[in-house]
């Protein structure tokens, strides 16, 4: 009873801290569940696909970013964070397989193990936030709670994005700069205070004592220099956009103590020179490793010292050149300059985005009104964090391709500055200089603690949980179970049988998740000690958002080619599959009916992986067949549920229930098996298999 009373009477800070630990546990748990949601193809194709495929000699896709002729992705960090840990994991897996027949290498491991590494790295953001709060005497409980409950950490922090590493490195850099600023301000203040005392001292003994005290002050001018320069080099090679995030942080580090008697431009220039000098070892290491990996530099050339500038690869420069090509960036999507500010910021940070934009607008207004006395001091933590938010935001808005994940490094400074507003409201005191009736009404009804304080934390929770569920478990969530199912098909298929998979209106399928030994490299048989090359038996065709009529033409071409090989001398058997969102099932049926493919192509629905939402094929909000809405299973042999005329039925609960059922059933990824029949043309070419549906 006493423990219950103590638990109920604990302070708000303790409640926030205990809630944070719950969210931290959820972050770890989401790694092992695992999250089925597929946020963006770059999660796999910028690191995991290549590293896992190379290490385990699996079939994998090497995107244009890893092209040996002009590589734009550095291999050092993915190699250190994935390839080396995979070696230890493989050793443990082989031992457990030999001793207890446990198989730890498969689709699940290829997803979970890299995510576990990146999730552990994500906790460095929490540590840096806690450290800065302790250094500056700030409340860390609510800030940690905001960080831990953010969908950015729950989703992006547990995924293998280069943006997640960029966020962690920016957090470390901010932590080091903040510590250096505090130490410099403290030491400079004490030094100038002692110098004044020294000048006023009358006796020699007192001057000696003060001189000893001044010399005992700790060094501060070059604090954390090596660590900061190394982080900057690693950040730029990870993502060259780190230049935009790191530049204001390094600038504040260089300006520490400027304007005092102790720090002059000589110190400023010395810091710049030594910073560049300390960055050289990391710079040489990254360039050397990338040059070896992309085969621009060989050990033979290194031994013979036959070297030229062409032997070295500088991937950040290649990245910048590629992104300066407007046609290249346009292929990924062109966005207006206001997307980051008006869409991505509110999407990532919801109420805290509004708080930060409002606070920055207030700072700009006071600056242009020359109200300098109420502005934060330039060499303060508020100025540092504000610069870390809005300087990169401004320059990133000038780039025509804008995605929410590009702003992940803004998370740390934004939460540090504005997380307390989740409990205090947008403004605890009247923020305007003039007391105008309209401004007073605006403050009382929206900004004040009484008006906004009780609701902001609730809005924060609801929005972040909703976005975590959507991107973590619904968005493109059928791709992972599809890969696991195809992996099982290939493992159990008859010998000398080719498997062909056609996908449409879904994200690219990472080949390494299917767990197929590569046909492009030599494999080693440990029993016979012989090397062999495995013939290719899996083919994948990805057609993105291709219209269904054009998709059927592709299906006919692929099936025709397979039939030719099957009837040829090799008698090559095959299995042909089609994976499309369930929302397109009815459109697929209509396209088949109106094409001549219906006379010989038989589509058999094998499974529907739930849930799955492709924004490229959004479910129909109104069922196509109002008499009996049951998508995607309305295409039975008798076409039950179809209407010759789609009249609007009476508005009723039964009708709403059917419409809702239609919408829910469309939230899936349908897998069809296609075979060719030469029999009498059938009235229906899609049939439902006897197999049960698989809920992913």
Swiss-Prot record:
Keyword Transmembrane applies: yes
Disulfide linkage: none
Subcellular location: Endoplasmic reticulum membrane
Molecular function terms from GO: alpha-1,2-mannosyltransferase activity; mannosyltransferase activity
GO cellular component, one term: endoplasmic reticulum membrane
Lineage top rank: taxon: Eukaryota
Enzyme's top EC category: transferase
Annotated InterPro entries: GPI_mannosylTrfase
Entry EC no(s): 2.4.1.-
Pfam families: Glyco_transf_22
Annotated membrane topology: Multi-pass membrane protein
Gene Ontology biological process terms, A to Z: GPI anchor biosynthetic process
Transmembrane residue ranges: 100-120, 125-142, 149-169, 185-205, 227-247, 338-358
Keywords: Endoplasmic reticulum, Glycosyltransferase, GPI-anchor biosynthesis, Membrane, Transferase, Transmembrane, Transmembrane helix
Pathway membership: Glycolipid biosynthesis; glycosylphosphatidylinositol-anchor biosynthesis
Family: Belongs to the glycosyltransferase 22 family. PIGZ subfamily.
Function of the protein: Mannosyltransferase involved in glycosylphosphatidylinositol-anchor biosynthesis. Transfers a fourth mannose to some trimannosyl-GPIs during GPI precursor assembly.
Name of the protein in question: GPI mannosyltransferase 4
Underlying gene: PIG-Z
């Amino acid at each position: 009873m006493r423990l219950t009373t103590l638990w109920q009477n604990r302070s708000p800070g303790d409640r926030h801290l205990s809630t944070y630990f719950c969210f931290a546990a959820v972050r770890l748990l989401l790694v092992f569940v695992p999250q089925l949601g597929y946020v963006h193809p770059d999660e796999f194709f910028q690191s995991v696909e290549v590293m896992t495929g190379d290490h385990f000699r699996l079939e994998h896709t090497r995107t244009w970013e890893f092209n040996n002729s002009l590589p734009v992705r550095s291999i050092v960090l993915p190699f250190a964070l994935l390839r080396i840990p995979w070696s230890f994991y493989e050793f443990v897996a082989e031992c457990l397989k030999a001793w207890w027949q446990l198989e730890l290498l498969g689709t699940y491991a290829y997803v979970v193990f890299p995510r576990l590494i990146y999730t552990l790295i994500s906790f460095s953001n929490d540590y840096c936030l806690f450290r800065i709060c302790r250094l500056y005497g700030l409340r860390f409980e609510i800030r940690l709670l905001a960080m831990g409950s953010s969908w950015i950490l729950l989703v992006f922090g547990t995924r293998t994005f280069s943006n997640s590493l960029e966020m962690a490195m920016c957090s470390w850099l901010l932590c080091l700069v903040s510590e250096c600023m505090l130490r410099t301000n403290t030491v400079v203040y004490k030094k100038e205070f002692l110098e004044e005392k020294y000048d006023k001292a009358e006796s020699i003994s007192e001057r000696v004592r003060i001189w000893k005290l001044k010399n005992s002050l700790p060094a501060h001018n070059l604090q954390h220099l090596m660590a900061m320069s190394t982080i900057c080099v690693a950040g730029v090679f990870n993502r060259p956009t780190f230049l935009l995030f790191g530049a204001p942080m390094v600038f504040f580090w260089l300006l520490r103590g400027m304007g005092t008697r102790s720090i002059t431009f000589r110190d400023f220039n010395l810091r710049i020179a030594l910073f560049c000098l300390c960055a050289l070892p990391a710079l040489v290491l990254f360039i050397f490793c990338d040059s070896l990996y992309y085969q621009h530099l060989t050990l033979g050339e290194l031994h013979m010292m036959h070297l030229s500038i062409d032997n070295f690869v500088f991937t950040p420069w290649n990245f910048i050149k590629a992104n300066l090509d407007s046609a290249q960036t346009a292929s990924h999507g062109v966005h207006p300059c206001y997307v980051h500010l008006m869409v991505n910021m509110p999407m990532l940070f919801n109420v805290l985005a509004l708080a930060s934009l409002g606070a920055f607008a207030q700072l700009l207004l006071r600056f242009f009104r020359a109200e300098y006395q109420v502005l934060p001091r330039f060499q303060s933590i508020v100025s540092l964090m504000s610069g870390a938010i809005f300087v990169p935001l401004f320059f990133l808005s000038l780039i025509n391709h804008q995605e929410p994940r590009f702003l992940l490094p803004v998370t740390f400074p934004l939460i540090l500055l504005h997380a307390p507003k989740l409990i205090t409201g947008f403004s605890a005191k009247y923020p305007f200089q003039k007391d105008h009736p309209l401004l007073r009404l605006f403050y009382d009804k929206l900004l004040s603690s009484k008006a906004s304080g009780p609701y902001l934390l609730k809005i924060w929770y609801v929005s972040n949980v909703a976005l975590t569920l959507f991107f973590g478990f619904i968005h493109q969530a059928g791709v992972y179970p599809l890969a696991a199912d195809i992996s099982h098909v290939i493992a159990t298929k008859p010998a000398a049988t080719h498997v062909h998979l056609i996908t449409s209106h879904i994200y690219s399928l990472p080949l390494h998740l299917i767990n197929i030994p590569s046909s492009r490299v030599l494999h080693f048989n440990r029993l016979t000690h012989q090397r062999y090359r495995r013939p290719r038996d899996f083919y994948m065709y990805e057609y993105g958002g291709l219209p269904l009529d054009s998709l059927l033409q592709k299906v006919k071409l692929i099936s025709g080619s397979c039939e030719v090989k099957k009837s040829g001398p090799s008698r090559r058997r095959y299995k042909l599959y089609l994976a499309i969102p369930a929302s397109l099932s009815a459109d697929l049926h209509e396209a088949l009916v109106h094409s001549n493919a219906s006379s010989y192509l038989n589509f058999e629905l094998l499974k529907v992986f739930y849930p799955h939402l492709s924004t490229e094929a959004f479910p129909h909000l109104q069922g196509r067949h109002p008499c009996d809405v049951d998508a995607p299973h309305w295409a039975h042999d008798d076409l039950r549920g179809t209407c010759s005329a789609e009249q609007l039925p009476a508005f009723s609960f039964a009708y709403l229930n059917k419409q809702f059922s239609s919408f829910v059933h469309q939230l899936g990824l349908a897998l069809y098996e296609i075979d060719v029949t030469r029999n009498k043309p059938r009235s229906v070419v899609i049939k439902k298999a006897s197999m049960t549906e698989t809920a992913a």
